[in-house]
Amino acid sequence: KDSAILIGDSAHATVPFYGQGMNCGFEDCRIFDNLLDQCTNDLENCFEQFSKIRKPNGDGVQDLSMHNFIVMRDKTADPLFLLQKKIEKKFSNLYPDKWIPLYSMVSFTNISYSEAWKLGQKQEKIMHEVMRTPDIDKIWDSEEIMQKIDSFL
């Protein structure tokens, strides 16, 4: 129970469609190092805490990677998907404290993978409703649409 622990790709092997394998492994090392400092001479407890902390994030990076694969495979040529991304970008530029695009959350913040996945799913539900707006392709950059997104937050 206290003689070995898996970190990096051996602990959370995933498809390569988010490019986060090495980053996730470095994060494992940082967190494990902090836990070693806290759990002096109690490796079993250290390993248990590490697993409790990292398992949800290993699952999160897997979910994010599979989602990104599906997006790259199925959606990048879809005009409605591209419009949705333009709307999200505009809202994020106007209200960066209220909306961080999923890719930016994962790649440029310290938000955990599991939390980014949850927030990304919430954002997707909001955008699903926004994209159902009549004539969204004509009014996408209007204040009305920005207020609609804000009202869901």
Predicted features, each with a name:
Residues N34-L153:
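C-terminal helical "tail/cap" subdomain of flavin- and related membrane-associated enzymes
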